[in-house]
Amino acid sequence: KDINTIDLGAGNGKNELLNLTLQDVLDMGKKDGSGNINLTILGDSQDKVSFKDEIGKTWEKQANSVTENNKTFDVYTNSDSTVQVKVEDKISDGITS
């Protein structure tokens, strides 16, 4: 709980974070002063992250990526507008149903 960054590591082999649900992110994420959860996942091309859709709680990959600290991130949102997850673009990422 109270996590805002997960570092899967770079150059340390294949690490996977699979089937993340909205509840998983709500349970582990740290809320900011506005009550929003902004989770950042770092890693490299050997790593994999997937989000799991549930009834009424679907993930969406945003069309535009964002750049912070010279790193580019894919941005995922869910039906809960207070949640945003940024996944470093080198990581293999996607949504499962």
List where the protein language model places each region.
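Low-complexity acidic/polar repeat-biased segments
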Residues: D47-S97
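Feature marks extracellular polysaccharide-active and adherence modules
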Residues: D7-G11, L42-D44
